[in-house]
Swiss-Prot record:
Domain SUEL-type lectin: 746-827
EC number: 3.2.1.23
Pfam families: BetaGal_gal-bd, GHD, Glyco_hydro_35, SUEL_Lectin
UniProt catalytic activity: Hydrolysis of terminal non-reducing beta-D-galactose residues in beta-D-galactosides
Organism of origin: Oryza sativa subsp. japonica
Protein name: Beta-galactosidase 1
Length: 827
């Protein structure tokens, strides 16, 4: 009897356990690969992905960004993991706010998308110090990204922390989560041969792969830009503007493009880079023509370098990147829509592309036809790599005209469904509109307060003293942009000198006996510069205070962490009229990081702190000054920016949230690419090949993003500015980002769409002409006007958010030679 009960109970328990295991397995996804593609749940898949970096937006923005990515035809979201954001101090972690990475991945999962986890933990990304914490420099024996125990111990500790967080939240595919790939290290192959220690570099990269695989994440590990000395247990991948001619280092693994650069980052002294929708589509189409399987746009949404996160040095606060979604999350048209059309066509051919046999036929040096066949179906690509001429290509008896630098895709090898150079999507021009809050005054009313510099005008009360000029990052652990170097000397009688300081900057302010006597900053990418200023010493003790400031730390290159910053080594000299120098380099220097108001956290407006502001005449061009104003949040849901034109350089906060560094006084350089734009030919971000640049000769960044979640509706919001270099706040204003003009074009038989989006309606149709030859969207001129087209679009579109009109032969005007109709409307 007891035996039967025991046996029955055992069978019941086993059955319950089986059910529990089965229930736990529901939704679990297997991920493997072969030479054609990733294999997800036993099915070969083409994956279209886009990079969205969670710290470069806010949690409130994430669902909308991810939704738009999915609606744009993407399957996956790719992101780096930002080590120095998550571990700003050793073993002190931050996973809150826009660093809540688990929440970000859950948003991806909720949208029904896959995710690609790029741990690094070195990431480059134009992020401060490439994502590596500055405190690593404090650890004895530390060598970044080489085979040494101090670095590898810290790297493994952080990697394991991130992996365990993802496992605990069931984020990996085998747990039912969205993560289908994980990356270790980043672009190591670009620097591996430049480290002067090939053995250590090789041992390190193989250690990385072994360490990663021991994490048992259940999905493949990848390494990007690792074409040589590739560990056997990772998949190497490509980064670049074009990856069609690249193939992995061995057979049996798929062709993956982890970074297709949709534009380029911006530096304070450079104009805005624009990569055309035609060229990106051309690159993507060629990649899949030549056996590509997974392609990721870097970036799909660039976002904002809030706080002190921008790298470089000299990377701007905006990380817009000319991505399909702009810095604020708006659709960048026609780039977003043109790529969406491409994605739809590629997905319609997925089975044929990943299973079919393929045949390449060359029609000369720059023309290739690729045919994929599977059973009775076929799909074809025709590419024309000539950048200066259109060509006719005959395929299966039919002739197809290909514009220069384009790819045509024929899902049935008969009819062209997509050509990379022929854009059907509208163009949208976004504008900055004045604040429309009901109670908002015409201009902001300011109070101001000087930064308290007096504690730093002597060489007393420092953190420590040293008889040498030290490197800034090591000394400050990058806890502030600012580091004070202070010393004193006794002088007999009065004397006139020239103060000479050699520094690796990035900025320098010099004070003698409490007075600002000179300032300078590095220019043209050369971060070694000199400050020379006349100075008078008085009889007795004289104080010299030098304030060195950084503008983002270097994030890329071999041994980039060894690039010195600050007045390291100097020399610092006082030179008299005869050329005789007093060398102060080995004097007793007192060091202190940061400014007084940083220590008091004035930006947080804490209850115990009283703002001792002056409400009288507002000083302008006064360095080291705080300005404060309140404003009503702009009405509606449009993105908000603050226009800081008139200011020089500093930092801005809204309601205690750091918007980032500002520097609108820095003018973008004039470059040859500012005056020409042609999608044809290989895109370059450097050298003679640059083109399609805008903003030359203008403020490098005038507008700064204020996310809606930073604002309080219906109550006063606080804007706080720290003006470091001296500017004029009188023109500062809040604005909203709205569609200004929308434009489209087409020929007879085409159905074209105009959409303002975001709840905005078309207010007028301004142009409806054939053969428009001058201007850009928002400023088109000329052409042969069509009254019939104007009336049709006015009737269909005005007062509506979106409208679609078919172009008919009835629109053609008498004597109009062109068959292409251009329509421009105002939102």
């Amino acid at each position: 009897m007891m035996g039967r009960r025991g046996s029955s109970w055992c069978r019941w328990w086993v059955a319950l356990l089986v059910l529990a295991v089965a229930a736990d397995a529901v939704g679990c996804t297997s991920v493997s690969y072969d030479d054609r593609s990733l294999v997800i749940d036993g099915q070969r898949r083409i994956i279209l992905s886009g990079s969205i970096h969670y710290p470069r937006s806010t949690p409130e923005m994430w669902p909308d960004l991810i939704k738009k990515a999915k609606e744009g035809g993407l399957d996956a979201i790719e992101t780096y993991i930002f080590w120095n954001g998550h571990e700003p101090h050793r073993r002190q972690y931050n996973f809150e706010g826009n660093y809540d990475v688990v929440r970000f991945f859950k948003e991806i999962q909720n949208a029904g998308m896959y995710a690609i986890l790029r741990i690094g933990p070195y990431i480059c990304g134009e992020w401060n110090y490439g994502g590596l914490p500055a405190w690593l420099r404090d650890i004895p024996g530390m060598q970044f990204r080489l085979h040494n125990e101090p670095f590898e111990n810290e790297m493994e500790t952080f990697t394991t922390l991130i992996v365990n967080k993802m496992k605990d939240s069931k984020m990996f595919a085998e747990q039912g989560g969205p993560i289908i790939l994980a990356q270790i290290e980043n672009e190591y192959g670009n620097i591996m041969g430049k480290l002067n220690n090939n053995q250590s570099a090789s041992e390190y990269i193989h250690w990385c792969a072994d360490m990663a695989n021991k994490q048992n994440v259940g999905v493949p590990w990848i390494m990007c830009q690792q074409d040589d000395d590739v560990p056997h247990n990772v998949v190497n991948t490509c980064n670049g503007f074009y990856c069609h001619d690249w193939f992995p280092n061995r057979t049996g693994i798929p062709k993956i493009w982890t970074e297709n650069w949709t534009g380029w980052f911006k530096a304070w002294d450079k104009p805005d880079f624009h990569r055309s929708a035609e060229d990106i589509a051309f690159a993507v189409a060629m990649f899949f023509q030549k056996r590509g399987s997974l392609q990721n746009y870097y970036m799909y949404h660039g976002g904002t370098n809030f706080g002190r996160t921008s790298g470089g040095p000299y990377i701007t606060t905006s990380y817009d990147y000319d991505a399909p979604l702009d810095e604020y999350g708006n659709l960048r048209q026609p780039k977003y829509g043109h790529l969406k059309e491409l994605h739809s066509v590629l997905k319609s051919m997925e089975k044929t592309l990943v299973h079919g046999e393929y045949f390449d036929t060359n029609y000369g040096d720059n023309i290739t036809v690729t045919k994929y066949t599977l059973d009775s179906s076929s799909a074809c690509f025709i590419n024309n790599r000539f950048d200066d001429k259109d060509v006719n290509v005959t395929l299966d008896g039919a002739t197809h005209l290909l514009p220069a630098w384009s790819v045509s895709i024929l899902p049935d090898c008969k009819t062209v469904a997509f050509n990379s150079a022929k854009i059907k999507t509208q163009t949208s021009v976004m504008v900055k509109k004045p604040n429309t809050a009901e109670q908002e005054q015409e201009s902001l009313k300011w109070s101001w307060m000087p930064e308290n510099l007096s504690p730093f005008m002597t060489d007393e009360k420092g953190n420590f003293r040293k008889n040498e000029l030290l490197e800034q990052i090591v000394t400050s652990t990058d806890q502030s942009d600012y580091l004070w170097y202070r010393t004193s000397l006794n002088h007999k009688g009065e004397g006139s000198y020239k103060l000479y300081v050699n520094t690796t900057g990035h900025e320098l302010y010099a004070f003698v006996n409490g007075k600002l006597i000179g300032k300078n900053h590095s220019a043209d990418g050369d971060f070694v510069f000199q400050l020379e200023s006349p100075v008078k010493l008085h009889d007795g003790k004289n104080y010299i205070s030098l304030l060195s400031a950084t503008v983002g730390l270097k994030n890329y290159g071999p041994s980039f962490e060894k690039m010195p910053t600050g007045i390291v080594g100097g020399p610092v000299k006082l030179i008299d009229s005869n050329g005789t120098a007093i060398d102060l380099s080995n004097s007793s220097w007192s060091y202190k990081a940061g400014l007084a108001s940083e220590y008091r956290q004035i930006h947080l407006d804490k209850p115990g702190y009283k703002w001792n502001g002056n409400n009288g005449t507002i000083p302008i061009n006064r360095p080291f000054t705080w300005y404060k104003a309140t404003f009503e949040a702009p009405s509606g849901e449009d993105a908000v920016v603050v226009d800081l034109l008139g200011l020089n350089k500093g930092v801005a906060w809204v309601n205690g949230n750091n918007l980032g560094r500002y520097w609108p006084s820095y003018t973008a350089a004039e470059m040859a690419g500012c005056h020409r734009c042609d999608y044809r030919g290989a895109f370059q971000a450097e050298g003679d090949g640059t083109r399609c640049l805008t903003g030359c000769g203008e403020p490098s960044q005038r507008y700064y993003h204020v996310p809606r979640s930073f604002l309080a509706a219906g109550e006063p919001n606080t804007l706080l500015l720290f003006e470091e270099a001296g500017g004029d706040p009188s023109g500062v204003a809040l604005r909203t980002v709205v569609p200004g003009a929308v434009c489209t074009s087409g020929e007879a038989g085409d159905a074209v769409t105009l959409s303002c989006g975001g709840g905005h309606a078309v207010s007028s149709v301004d142009v409806a002409s054939f053969g428009v030859g001058r201007g850009r969207c928002g400023g088109y001129e000329g052409g042969c006007e069509s009254k019939a087209a104007y009336e049709a679009f006015t009737a269909a579109c005005v007062g509506k958010e979106s409208c679609t009109v078919e172009i008919t032969g009835a629109f053609a005007g008498a004597g109009c030679l062109s068959g292409v109709l251009t329509v421009q409307a105002t939102c």
